[in-house]
Amino acid sequence: MSRSNAHLNPLECTQQALHWIHSDTLSPDDMAALNQEVLSCFREYVNPGFLEYRKSVTTGGDYGAVEWRASGPNTLIDTQGNEYLDCLGGYGIFNVGHRNPNVIAAVESQLARQPLHSQELLDPLRGLLAKTLAALTPGNLKYSFFSNSGTESVEAALKLAKAYQSPRGKYTFIAATGAFHGKSLGALSATAKPAFRRPFMPLLPGFHHVAFGDISAMRKQVQQCQKTGDDVAAIILEPIQGEGGVIVPPENYLPAVRALCDEVGALLILDEVQTGMGRTGKMFACEHYGVQPDILCLAKALGGGVMPIGATVATEAVFSVLFENPFLHTTTFGGNPLACAAALATVNELLTKNLPEQAAIQGEFLLQGLQQLAAEYPQLIIEARGMGLLQAIEFRKNEIGYAFAKELFQRNILVAGTLNNSKSVRIEPPLTITREQCARVLKEAKDVLKKLNGTMPDENKMKEYAVE
């Protein structure tokens, strides 16, 4: 059988990669070679489409920034030696900063002892992390299922809700327009972006979407489901929509949804994959509203920016449906020792360093500054909004938002648009960001807006920044 990749030697590939992995420093020649190799690998073996969305990739495709190492809790360096202030935070994974030394130390200690679990013996850190989350999460959430990502934590939540509600004849889920819950089949059924959904239709049946923040629309949908016998098993929401554009709901919305769930016997699933672990100024965003879910989804920052881990935390009443057969829903690597070590150290960092409080303090300063800029440039900006250090600037056109992000990149500040709302540029730095760094962001943002204000009225100039 002929192989189209017969010219490739896998041993040479691994040896070349290991050379770079084990290199503390790179010579200029090594940097240039690595940069070109990575661009080639993405183009030929990963997905060339990704290069179209990188702010660092030039029109000719001859340059793309390749990250090399973290240079501090809030900064990273590329292979060319450029240092960037990270205001994207890996979409919210670096809450305790890049390469947090205490998280790394915990993982290294576990790595030296036993990297992965045997599956048959009881792994201690999984138990200790579950106990920690029971103590950390609001209300009477108690039992935890561990996975490897946010979409997996949502899948587990949906399956858990189905297992609990199916004997009660309830199979329907209600989510929100603008929602993002992941891209695996079940999570995608709750996600609302048409571009992500259409190629995989039909998705799972029994999902409805209503306007986020509109309790009247939610109640009408529940009532309509009841009229047709499609009783609601669960309502799944993000307390604040992240990929929808950092949409903060009315203050009474989540309490009203909680009351509606109690009224009709539906479960409330809150997806705090992005809003959890101190991001919004409290450990969990639902705490701003005094609301406790029946099932809570966590991931992203739970691993401290060192290990991937997801968690689905539920009340005993709900989780007990898995007691009889704990193998109904499992995953090989979920709750592995390295991930649990990272998560335990992350929680410790958040608590001992008061990082949720820091997010509230620095977030208030940053948001006030962004809102002042929005008032100065209403022709460009609709509004700046957010909570804690989950913030967004919504521009009047997609092209303006992309141009803003690209100009900030040229000034060595990383930001990005949100997946479901291209006009909204998110600002989501590590919770360790300093006041001085926040001030730098505001200064550079003001300079960029001043520049764009002079160029954006010319539609021909805007084509340079357009994203098809």
Curated annotation (Swiss-Prot):
- PROSITE patterns according to UniProt: AA_TRANSFER_CLASS_3
Report whether rRNA-binding shows up as a keyword of the record.
no
Per its UniProt record, the required cofactor names are: pyridoxal 5'-phosphate
Task: Look up the coiled coil feature and give its residue ranges.
Answer: none
Residues at which pyridoxal 5'-phosphate binds: 150-151, 274, 332
Q: Which EC main class describes this enzyme? A: transferase
Mind telling me which InterPro entries this protein's record contains?
Aminotrans_3, Aminotrans_3_PPA_site, Class-III_PLP-dep_AT, Putrescine_aminotransferase, PyrdxlP-dep_Trfase, PyrdxlP-dep_Trfase_major, PyrdxlP-dep_Trfase_small
Q: Which GO terms describe its molecular function?
A: diamine transaminase activity; identical protein binding; putrescine--2-oxoglutarate transaminase activity; pyridoxal phosphate binding
Its UniProt pathway annotation is: Amine and polyamine degradation; putrescine degradation; 4-aminobutanal from putrescine (transaminase route): step 1/1
Pfam families, A to Z: Aminotran_3 (PF00202)
What are the protein's UniProt keywords? Aminotransferase, Pyridoxal phosphate, Transferase
N6-(pyridoxal phosphate)lysine modifications at: 300
**Can you state which reaction this protein catalyses?**
an alkane-alpha,omega-diamine + 2-oxoglutarate = an omega-aminoaldehyde + L-glutamate; putrescine + 2-oxoglutarate = 1-pyrroline + L-glutamate + H2O; cadaverine + 2-oxoglutarate = 5-aminopentanal + L-glutamate
The reply to whether Transferase figures as a keyword in the UniProt entry is yes
Q: Name one GO biological process term.
A: putrescine catabolic process
Q: What is its EC number?
A: 2.6.1.82, 2.6.1.29
Task: State the family it belongs to.
Answer: Belongs to the class-III pyridoxal-phosphate-dependent aminotransferase family. Putrescine aminotransferase subfamily.
Q: What does this protein do?
A: Catalyzes the aminotransferase reaction from putrescine to 2-oxoglutarate, leading to glutamate and 4-aminobutanal, which spontaneously cyclizes to form 1-pyrroline. This is the first step in one of two pathways for putrescine degradation, where putrescine is converted into 4-aminobutanoate (gamma-aminobutyrate or GABA) via 4-aminobutanal. Also functions as a cadaverine transaminase in a a L-lysine degradation pathway to succinate that proceeds via cadaverine, glutarate and L-2-hydroxyglutarate.
Q: Which PANTHER family match?
A: AMINOTRANSFERASE CLASS III, PUTRESCINE AMINOTRANSFERASE
Q: What protein am I looking at?
A: Putrescine aminotransferase
Annotated organism of origin = Pectobacterium atrosepticum (strain SCRI 1043 / ATCC BAA-672)
Read off the lineage from the record: Bacteria, Pseudomonadati, Pseudomonadota, Gammaproteobacteria, Enterobacterales
Chain's gene name: patA
